[in-house]
Protein backbone atom coordinates (compact mmCIF):
# COMPACT_ATOMS: atom_id res chain seq x y z
CA UNK A 1 0.00 0.00 0.00
CA UNK A 2 1.24 3.48 -0.87
CA UNK A 3 1.02 4.68 2.72
CA UNK A 4 4.31 6.58 2.56
CA UNK A 5 4.91 9.70 0.50
CA UNK A 6 7.62 8.74 -2.02
CA UNK A 7 6.99 10.97 -5.04
CA UNK A 8 9.39 10.27 -7.91
CA UNK A 9 8.21 12.76 -10.54
CA UNK A 10 6.85 11.52 -13.86
CA UNK A 11 7.97 8.03 -14.90
CA UNK A 12 7.19 7.42 -18.61
CA UNK A 13 5.61 3.96 -18.93
CA UNK A 14 3.47 3.72 -22.07
CA UNK A 15 1.86 5.69 -24.88
CA UNK A 16 -1.55 6.35 -26.38
CA UNK A 17 0.06 6.84 -29.81
CA UNK A 18 -1.36 4.93 -32.77
CA UNK A 19 1.63 2.58 -32.84
CA UNK A 20 0.63 1.34 -29.40
CA UNK A 21 4.27 0.59 -28.73
CA UNK A 22 6.22 2.51 -26.09
CA UNK A 23 9.92 2.33 -26.86
CA UNK A 24 11.24 4.93 -24.43
CA UNK A 25 12.51 6.97 -27.37
CA UNK A 26 14.05 10.29 -26.37
CA UNK A 27 14.82 13.50 -28.20
CA UNK A 28 18.16 15.23 -27.56
CA UNK A 29 17.57 18.92 -26.81
CA UNK A 30 20.24 21.38 -25.70
CA UNK A 31 20.38 22.98 -22.24
CA UNK A 32 21.95 26.45 -22.04
CA UNK A 33 25.41 26.58 -20.50
CA UNK A 34 25.13 27.98 -16.97
CA UNK A 35 21.35 27.40 -16.73
CA UNK A 36 20.74 28.06 -13.04
CA UNK A 37 18.12 25.45 -12.10
CA UNK A 38 18.77 21.76 -11.42
CA UNK A 39 16.67 19.36 -13.49
CA UNK A 40 15.98 15.87 -12.14
CA UNK A 41 14.90 12.60 -13.77
CA UNK A 42 11.10 12.83 -13.97
CA UNK A 43 10.85 16.65 -14.09
CA UNK A 44 8.76 18.29 -16.79
CA UNK A 45 10.77 20.46 -19.18
CA UNK A 46 9.75 23.12 -21.71
CA UNK A 47 11.28 24.69 -24.79
CA UNK A 48 12.29 28.34 -24.46
CA UNK A 49 12.96 30.95 -27.14
CA UNK A 50 16.71 30.26 -27.12
CA UNK A 51 16.04 26.81 -28.60
CA UNK A 52 16.95 25.08 -25.34
CA UNK A 53 14.98 23.36 -22.56
CA UNK A 54 14.41 24.49 -19.00
CA UNK A 55 12.53 22.98 -16.08
CA UNK A 56 8.80 23.66 -16.38
CA UNK A 57 7.84 24.93 -12.92
CA UNK A 58 4.10 25.29 -13.54
CA UNK A 59 1.55 23.76 -11.20
CA UNK A 60 -1.97 24.47 -12.49
CA UNK A 61 -0.69 25.06 -16.02
CA UNK A 62 2.31 23.59 -17.81
CA UNK A 63 3.77 24.12 -21.28
CA UNK A 64 5.89 20.97 -21.39
CA UNK A 65 7.78 19.54 -24.31
CA UNK A 66 8.22 16.35 -22.28
CA UNK A 67 9.81 14.53 -19.36
CA UNK A 68 13.52 14.88 -18.55
CA UNK A 69 15.17 11.45 -18.25
CA UNK A 70 18.84 12.40 -18.13
CA UNK A 71 21.56 14.40 -19.84
CA UNK A 72 25.12 14.39 -21.11
CA UNK A 73 27.81 17.08 -20.96
CA UNK A 74 31.54 17.55 -20.71
CA UNK A 75 32.31 18.01 -17.02
CA UNK A 76 33.91 21.41 -16.39
CA UNK A 77 35.83 19.78 -13.51
CA UNK A 78 37.23 16.62 -15.12
CA UNK A 79 36.95 17.40 -18.82
CA UNK A 80 35.28 13.99 -19.27
CA UNK A 81 31.99 13.27 -21.03
CA UNK A 82 29.46 12.78 -18.23
CA UNK A 83 26.08 11.03 -18.39
CA UNK A 84 23.72 11.89 -15.54
CA UNK A 85 20.11 11.49 -14.37
CA UNK A 86 20.36 15.07 -13.10
CA UNK A 87 21.40 18.33 -14.68
CA UNK A 88 23.40 20.12 -11.95
CA UNK A 89 22.36 23.79 -11.72
CA UNK A 90 24.74 26.32 -13.28
CA UNK A 91 26.87 23.72 -15.08
CA UNK A 92 29.05 25.55 -17.58
CA UNK A 93 29.57 23.44 -20.72
CA UNK A 94 28.92 24.08 -24.39
CA UNK A 95 27.65 20.57 -25.15
CA UNK A 96 24.86 19.98 -22.60
CA UNK A 97 22.15 17.78 -24.09
CA UNK A 98 18.96 16.78 -22.25
CA UNK A 99 17.29 13.45 -22.99
CA UNK A 100 13.57 14.19 -23.20
CA UNK A 101 10.62 11.83 -23.70
CA UNK A 102 8.68 14.26 -25.89
CA UNK A 103 5.77 12.09 -27.06
CA UNK A 104 2.62 14.22 -26.46
CA UNK A 105 0.72 10.96 -25.87
CA UNK A 106 3.11 9.49 -23.30
CA UNK A 107 1.58 7.90 -20.20
CA UNK A 108 3.40 8.54 -16.92
CA UNK A 109 3.28 7.01 -13.46
CA UNK A 110 3.12 9.59 -10.66
CA UNK A 111 2.28 9.53 -6.98
CA UNK A 112 -0.40 11.78 -5.53
CA UNK A 113 0.23 13.87 -2.45
CA UNK A 114 -2.99 12.44 -0.94
CA UNK A 115 -5.60 9.73 -1.44
CA UNK A 116 -7.47 9.64 -4.76
CA UNK A 117 -10.74 7.71 -4.96
CA UNK A 118 -11.95 5.73 -8.00
CA UNK A 119 -14.10 8.76 -8.91
CA UNK A 120 -10.90 10.62 -9.82
CA UNK A 121 -10.45 8.49 -12.95
CA UNK A 122 -10.78 10.58 -16.11
CA UNK A 123 -10.46 13.89 -14.27
CA UNK A 124 -7.75 16.52 -14.55
CA UNK A 125 -5.16 17.46 -11.92
CA UNK A 126 -2.41 19.96 -11.14
CA UNK A 127 1.20 19.26 -10.21
CA UNK A 128 2.95 19.75 -6.87
CA UNK A 129 6.46 21.06 -7.63
CA UNK A 130 9.12 20.12 -5.06
CA UNK A 131 12.92 20.21 -5.16
CA UNK A 132 14.39 16.95 -6.47
CA UNK A 133 16.49 14.46 -4.52
CA UNK A 134 20.21 15.06 -5.01
CA UNK A 135 21.01 11.70 -3.40
CA UNK A 136 19.12 9.63 -5.99
CA UNK A 137 18.82 12.14 -8.84
CA UNK A 138 15.03 11.91 -9.04
CA UNK A 139 12.28 14.47 -9.21
CA UNK A 140 10.04 14.76 -6.15
CA UNK A 141 7.09 16.23 -8.08
CA UNK A 142 3.67 14.72 -7.42
CA UNK A 143 0.06 14.91 -8.53
CA UNK A 144 -1.94 17.46 -6.52
CA UNK A 145 -4.75 15.22 -5.28
CA UNK A 146 -6.77 18.16 -3.96
CA UNK A 147 -6.99 19.70 -7.45
CA UNK A 148 -9.10 16.94 -9.07
CA UNK A 149 -11.56 18.67 -11.37
CA UNK A 150 -12.99 18.79 -14.87
CA UNK A 151 -11.16 22.09 -15.53
CA UNK A 152 -9.79 21.76 -19.06
CA UNK A 153 -6.70 23.89 -18.42
CA UNK A 154 -5.24 21.62 -15.71
CA UNK A 155 -2.06 20.05 -17.11
CA UNK A 156 -2.58 16.33 -16.43
CA UNK A 157 -5.42 13.81 -16.76
CA UNK A 158 -5.75 10.64 -14.66
CA UNK A 159 -5.94 7.70 -17.09
CA UNK A 160 -5.55 4.77 -14.68
CA UNK A 161 -4.51 3.66 -11.22
CA UNK A 162 -1.45 1.59 -10.35
CA UNK A 163 -2.88 -1.53 -8.74
CA UNK A 164 -0.52 -4.03 -7.20
CA UNK A 165 1.02 -5.32 -3.98
CA UNK A 166 2.27 -1.86 -2.98
CA UNK A 167 -0.41 0.35 -4.48
CA UNK A 168 -4.19 0.48 -4.61
CA UNK A 169 -6.92 2.99 -5.41
CA UNK A 170 -7.53 5.23 -2.40
CA UNK A 171 -4.17 4.62 -0.71
CA UNK A 172 -2.94 7.54 1.40
CA UNK A 173 -0.60 8.51 -1.48
CA UNK A 174 -2.30 6.98 -4.50
CA UNK A 175 -0.14 6.03 -7.49
CA UNK A 176 -1.78 7.00 -10.78
CA UNK A 177 -1.12 6.90 -14.53
CA UNK A 178 -1.47 10.34 -16.12
CA UNK A 179 -1.15 11.93 -19.54
CA UNK A 180 -0.62 15.50 -20.67
CA UNK A 181 -4.03 17.15 -20.76
CA UNK A 182 -3.35 20.70 -21.89
CA UNK A 183 -0.38 22.77 -22.95
CA UNK A 184 2.04 20.28 -24.58
CA UNK A 185 4.22 22.43 -26.82
CA UNK A 186 3.79 20.22 -29.89
CA UNK A 187 0.02 20.72 -29.66
CA UNK A 188 0.12 24.52 -29.30
CA UNK A 189 -0.64 26.49 -32.45
CA UNK A 190 1.76 29.29 -31.50
CA UNK A 191 5.51 28.88 -31.27
CA UNK A 192 7.73 29.21 -28.23
Cite the ranges covered by each PLM segment.
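Surface-exposed, low-hydrophobicity beta-strand/loop segments enriched in small/polar/acidic residues
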Residues: 1-192
